Curated annotation (Swiss-Prot):
NCBIfam families: PS_II_psbM
Protein's recorded name: Photosystem II reaction center protein M
Paired cysteines (S-S): none
The organism's taxonomic lineage, starting at the top: Bacteria, Bacillati, Cyanobacteriota, Cyanophyceae, Synechococcales
Main location: membrane
Length: 36
């Protein structure tokens, strides 16, 4: 089975984008709680 580069990139982004979003959100809440 040949690997489809476009499909691979699409699945990578599909997993990566929400993960990065959650990490950034988590860091922002932590810094807000720490500063206040």
């Amino acid at each position: 089975m040949e690997t489809n580069d476009l499909g691979f990139v699409a699945s990578l982004m599909f997993v990566l984008v929400p993960t990065v979003f959650l990490i950034v959100l988590f860091i922002q809440t932590n810094s807000r709680e720490g500063s206040s």
